[in-house]
Amino acid sequence: MKFLRLIVPWLLVIVIILAALYLPDLGPENYKDFDSLFANERVRQGIAGYEVAIIKDGEIAFNEAYGFDGQRKPLEKSTPLYLGPASEILTGTLLCQFVNEKKIALDVPIAQFIPDLASLKAKRSGAASLDMPLTLRQLAAHRVAFPEKDLPDYDPEATGLEAGLPDPELFLRSHFPTENYTRSRLSYRIVGAILEKVSNRKYSDLLESMITIPLGMHLTTARPSSIENIAVGAGSFFGLTFPYLEKVPYDAAASDGIVTTSEDMAKFLKFVVSPERGQNIPGLASSQTPLLYQALYKDGDTGFGWRIVDSKKGRYIFQGGSIRGYSSRIVIYPERNAAIVILTSQDGIIISNFLLPTLVSCAEQILFNGESRRPFPTQRAELVAGFVFLIYLLSKIFQIQSSYSWARDLLKYRETGRSQLYVRLVLVRTIIGLLLRILIVVLAPVGALALVGRPVSYQELIAFEPGVSSMLMTALLFGAFRNISRLVMIVRLRRS
């Protein structure tokens, strides 16, 4: 009977995995057009909805919306969505415009604009504090780290999570630095504050007068309250979605809080990769747009808001990430006059670091090669993980319920003297397992700090990836409860 109870959960897991492997899949094996790719993969990847725009040969070749937002309202290509960390490319464009107009210099200490920041001590990753003022170039290039705890005025309630690099090795190297993380989400908020100080105008007014109005981006703004019908963001939980009704704070605009649409971003990206002859915006002529995606340092990986990765295949220029309820991925190919942008009403580490990059990669294959292979069906894997997790929880609940019989049987071994060593090993294993589970739960925010470069609360851990975070946390806690109940029963039985 005990053996049967032991193998039943594993049999259920095997059945679920086999069903997932052999059930018919959706869509063709290969995609040859953008519409079938994004229509099918939205379902296969478990994404609530997204807007897509693609620039090819300097023209807007594709612009469509699929799915729905957190409240299941259908998305359209003109539905406003939060841009998240990709807001940096618009702030970077403003900075470039100010530099071109000689209103500001990149190598000037930021304390010249905001004296309160004069005491800010910056340092390179793994190095001691730099004995020099922090400059605007260093800030815009994410060149140095600085103590975020000393900047409460620039740290709103909602913080974005910048997407990782396309190469796994580069992703790990950039997200697990030797000491301090340089890509602070506060960097471009400070840049935005400096632009306001220099111009004596609000950031939202600068964005409108210098970028959005000249380019006809009428639904792009740093003042979300000025736009109606912004899509409600969503979170994900094992392939299912739930709505977020909480809005992103206004003061996050310069780095995380700009609202836009795929239609508007298509206009902006078209200007960036292939502006029409003579097409200018204040401080940025059509011939100057390549400045936007040139590294601010020769050995750097960041331009005016853009991230730049050099590889054997050439430069990979991108930006994106997640903020509560929303994610985005933007990639440009300036040498080919092409660009891809995906905006989605759903957040999470998985969607911003894996799913959206995968979809961009597939679209890139169609764009340049005419065909793309069908990617891995993530939603199916998430549903399998959800069922396995449920079975695991049920097994742990049963083990907690049967703690008395477990302790009684263990003490019988000891009383009969048949296996004293076995009893001791079981008790030691139970205690160590309990301590390890508690330690992992307590240290989870510390591990997240190493990953994202800033202190992370338990609430944020669950918000950025509800399925995985809640699964791991619940599994650890239920395992700890099981061990506690077993140890308590052993103590009670020994006393009686």
Each model region followed by its residue ranges:
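Short, conserved catalytic-motif segment at the N-terminal edge
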Residues: 30-84, 100-105, 119-122, 128, ...
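Active-site SXXK
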Residues: 52, 58, 80-113, 188-196, ...
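Short, surface-exposed loop or secondary-structure junction motifs
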Residues: 122-324
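Stable alpha-helical elements in mature extracytoplasmic
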Residues: 30, 34-37, 50, 86-87, ...
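Short, glycine/proline-biased beta-turn/loop segments that scaffold the active-site neighborhood
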Residues: 106-123, 215
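Catalytic loop of the DD-peptidase/beta-lactamase superfamily, centered on the K-T-G motif
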Residues: 2-8, 16-62, 201, 246-496
